[in-house]
A protein has these predicted regions:
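S-adenosyl-L-methionine-dependent methyltransferase catalytic core, i.e., the SAM/SAH-binding region
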Residues: 1-291
């Protein structure tokens, strides 16, 4: 398993993953898969398709690539419709079910780029960023039910505070949750502007943008059940990867790091993962191994 912890910019903001034009850590992550021309590979975060195109460029006629994305927007980025490539519009938590559906028992490698793409952050209609006054949606899959507005309107104060603390790592989580519950008694919070107005007084002085980004991160993770999906996908990958197969994961925050590390340790204990050491570029935390 090759896990690469992304470095941050001068403001401490993670470099955005999976932009629809320039994939993050393209060479490092695909090199980590040690592509076999006739192998079977999975890209569970297709996004703009950059990582998938690089994998396909290294596959021969006998190779296969399955690429997952639950967002319908990603389908616009498909450029290869040949027999080697299969696009699966689904959450990657269902990886094992889909591989069974396609008759695939084992894979040679899997790549996961866990960051939010600039496409989502720059789309003012999706509610992923506080830069726009837009509906509090935050669903990666627009066909799914619960939105961020639903969570803010229905969770009790304790549950909402737990979400903000666990997934946003904000010490002021209980004060923010109390303010949300108080505000929604007057009117529901339905736009990012509504949330900003309620939460801004509780942001740390000098860290307002960073704290607000963490608040939005917490809601996004809860809306999309990201931690559960990640655990399920990694467990499935451990079962699907053949001996010597590779898992290359790009993480962007400590929550993803902890899940990846925990899953890797569990796989080591079960005899599914053999740790290896590889050099990675300065500024990134190395965590490598092979199944």
């Amino acid at each position: 398993m090759k896990a690469i912890r992304q470095i941050t910019d001068e403001d401490g903001k993670p470099v955005v993953a999976g932009t629809y034009h320039v994939p993050v850590l393209l060479k490092e992550s695909v090199d980590g898969l040690a592509i076999r021309p006739d192998g079977t590979y999975v890209d569970v975060t297709f996004g703009g398709g950059g990582h998938s195109r690089e994998i396909l460029s290294r596959l021969g006629e006998g190779g296969r690539l399955f690429s997952f994305d639950q967002d319908a927007d990603a389908e616009r980025n498909i450029t290869d419709t040949g027999s080697r490539f299969t696009f699966v519009r689904s959450n990657f938590r269902y990886l094992e079910n889909w591989m069974r559906y396609y008759g695939v028992e084992h894979i040679d490698g899997l790549l996961a780029d866990l960051g939010v793409s600039s496409h989502h952050l720059d789309d003012g209609s999706r509610g992923f960023s506080f830069r726009f006054d837009s509906p509090l949606d935050m669903r990666m899959n627009k066909r799914s039910g619960t939105t961020a507005a639903d969570i803010l309107d229905s969770y009790d104060e304790a549950r909402l505070a737990d979400v903000i603390y666990m997934y946003g790592e904000l010490r002021q989580s209980r004060r923010i949750a109390a303010a949300v519950v108080k505000a929604r008694r007057e009117a529901p919070l339905v736009t990012t502007g509504d949330l900003l107005k309620v939460a801004e007084p509780f942001m740390t002085r000098g860290r307002e943008k960073k704290d607000m980004a963490r608040l939005f991160q917490a809601l996004r993770i809860e809306v999309n059940h990201e931690t559960d999906a990640l655990r399920e996908m990694l467990a499935s990958a451990a079962r699907l990867l053949r001996p010597g197969g590779r898992l290359s994961v790009i993480t962007y925050h400590s929550i993803e790091d902890r899940i990846e590390i925990g899953q890797r340790r569990g796989s080591c204990g079960a005899g599914l993962l053999r740790p290896q050491t590889h050099a990675v570029p300065s500024g990134r935390l190395p965590s490598d191994g092979a199944f």
